[in-house]
Design a protein with these regions (language model features):
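Intrinsic low-complexity/IDR segments
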Residues: 1-35, 39, 45, 49-50, ...
Length: 168
């Protein structure tokens, strides 16, 4: 997709977000957005299902509640992107940069499509907390959870997951 066409879609989407005349939601389903410049873009509620966003610049983008199901985000730069409540089911995040990204309440893929992603401490602890919050029936796994629990409780999600304040 040409950057000029993309910019027009983003303009209409912004109008739609603001409930202004002439606005319409961004439908970028199956779009070829490889290496697209989406830095700082407002893509809240956008349909990006199965979009090819490989190596796209999504730094500081607002992707809250965006549907990125099955999207190719390999090597995408998502630094400081807001992905709260985003649907990332089946998305390929291999090699993506998620430093300082907000993935709270998102559907994050825990499969090989997330291999090689770059996480900051906050996201790592959040994922660890979720791993420690699940019930397992294997004794070795339970012991591993117990060992990792002090670190997991440093997550900002600890109070919600474990019913207690964060450890420092």
């Amino acid at each position: 997709m040409k950057q000029s066409d993309l910019n027009e879609i983003l303009k209409k989407h912004k109008r739609w977000i603001k409930n202004e005349e002439g606005g319409e939601p961004a439908n970028l389903q199956d779009a070829d957005l490889r290496r697209a410049d989406l830095q700082g873009a407002d893509l809240r509620y956008a349909d990006l299902r199965y979009a090819n966003l490989q190596s796209a610049d999504l730094q500081d983008a607002d992707l809250q509640v965006a549907n990125l199901r099955g999207a190719n985000l390999r090597y995408a730069d998502l630094q400081r992107a807001d992905l709260q409540v985003a649907n990332l089911q089946g998305a390929n995040l291999q090699g993506a940069n998620l430093l300082d990204a907000n993935l709270d309440y998102s559907c994050f893929p825990l499969w090989c499509g997330s291999k090689g992603i770059k996480l900051d401490r906050r996201l790592f602890l959040q994922l660890l907390a979720h791993i420690c919050a699940v019930e397992v029936d294997d004794e070795e796994c339970k012991k591993t959870q117990e060992y990792l629990m002090p670190l997991a409780k440093q997550s900002h999600a600890a109070k919600w997951l474990f019913g207690e304040e964060r450890g420092e």
